[in-house]
Amino acid sequence: MDTIKKLYDYGFDNHKYQKFMGIPKTIDNDLPVTDHCPGYGSAAKYIATSMTEIIADNDSFGATDPKLCVVEIMGRNAGWLTAASVLSDDSDCDGPDLVYCPEVPFDMNKYVSSVQNLLKEKKSIVIAASEGLRTADGKLVCEQAHDYEFIDAFGHRQLSGCGRVLANTIAKETGYKTRCIEFSILQRCATHLASRVDVDEAYNAGFIACEEAIKNNSGKMVTLQVREREPYICEYQTADVHMIANIEKKMPLHWITRDGSYVSKEFVNYVSPLVVGSLTPYYAGGLPKHMNRKYRNGHKVDVVTI
């Protein structure tokens, strides 16, 4: 929302009359004021679904081939996406064994001890870990991977390697077979697993932003406010973009267990309504088709290639 804030401030200071409305859209779900952000529900749905499938695969080897799998999930400073992995805990799956979010300092010794205790009870272990885990002294766990460091235009360090560090540490300490899986960009582009609630709310947020601009409102962001979670009722409001830009909303600490290795039932109640419903993609040749942005006669057009 920083761009909307800057555009609005520039227009106001220079007596320009364009209208600037913000529409939240981040799978990170880390914007303040709004209950949640469009995009998050679909990403959470993908993460929980994939986690269920990974756990089923890991369990299929049984005691004959014990192994540990660490799933690295996006989340620089906020654990909303990683926490969504617990939705896989259902009648057909026990969910991840450990869940580590960046809001709580990561302790490698406690982590190793927790895994060793789990290994006394089971031979198949799956762990969800945020890419942005930091130790108590503020150091990124992923830095121990010694990967090439890329800095983006905003000065953000590309985070990758946390999962490998956690998996390799257990392999070294126990001799067990370990594996690291990074969802990376898959968690934000898997439209075949989009949440119906999420898609509807994204559309509504855009529609309301346009309505507000037509009413001469500007410098605001559409917010989603959940009035009821059971049954689910979401309302749309607007808030001053200055209350939102450059402010990060993290997971409430009381939604994370005291030892920092799992999340609470309160979080499950929060996220569950956001992943409800599905969409049927358009298929051709057995594969889902996607809309592409292409140029025709110098203009961008939306094209579905069949």
Describe the function of each predicted region.
Residues 1-11, 17-21, 37-179:
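Accessory alpha-helical/coil subdomains and C-terminal extensions
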Residues 28-36:
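Glycine-rich, charge-decorated loop segments at or immediately adjacent to ligand/cofactor-binding or catalytic sites
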Residues 1-3, 29-30, 77-79, 135-137, ...:
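Flexible loop/turn segments at secondary-structure boundaries
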Residues 143-306:
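C-terminal non-catalytic interaction/assembly regions of soluble proteins
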Residues 35-38, 195-196:
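Short glycine-enriched, charge-decorated loop/helix-capping segments at active-site entrances
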Residues 22-26, 185:
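Mobile beta-alpha loop/short-helix "lid" or hinge segments that flank ligand
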